[in-house]
Amino acid sequence: YTFVSTANAFALRGAKIIFVDIRPDTMNIDETKIEAAITNKTKAIIPVHYAGVACEMDTIMKIASKYNLFVVEDAAQAIMSSYKGNPLGTIGHLGAFSFHETKNITSAGEGGLLLINDERFAERAEITREKGTNRSLFFRGMVDKYSWVDIGSSYLMNDVSAAYLWGQLEKIDEIQNNRLNSWNLYYEGLKNLEKHRYIE
């Protein structure tokens, strides 16, 4: 179970996407089916922590290590969620979060966060974020401002969106608790329907 943005991020850069079926109990990637989908062209595994429910990351990381693959966690819906005490998005090589208006924490529209858990990706991510220029070298006086070294775009959040997001991050526990209370209200109200087999 996923959303098109996850696949698009790779397909738009020429990657061939191979989907792996889900576990019906979590709606997340079925870790027992990953190995069968790996080919000699596979570069990465992209677990999607749907609705903040963690994928089976121990198994996924073992498979990635065995086949020398990268793991990019789609934690778009998993801010403040964890797996065995580790925050989601911090386990794989990279972790991606979304602040789209439909998420628990929003920047009043679009926006996101990339966690870089592997130093090999830090410089490339910075260059991509800065329209393909190496700003850290520019600020050290080593290159001019308009020396393009790679492809990129302007992935910098505007000040108003950043301020809006910051205000929510300061109250993230309260926001998450309110949402959990709403979830519990629905769960308690609907569980009798499950008991009487009106829903599964």
Language-model features and meaning:
Residues 1, 15, 22, 76-77, ...:
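Histidine-centered beta-alpha loop that forms part of the nucleotide-sugar donor binding/catalytic region
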Residues 1-31:
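Substrate-binding/gating loop at the entrance of the active-site cleft, primarily
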Residues 8-11, 66, 97, 114, ...:
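Charged/polar positions on well-ordered alpha helices
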Residues 21, 32, 36, 44-48, ...:
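PLP-dependent aminotransferase class I/II
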Residues 25-107, 113-120:
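Active-site phosphate-binding strand-loop segment of PLP-dependent enzymes
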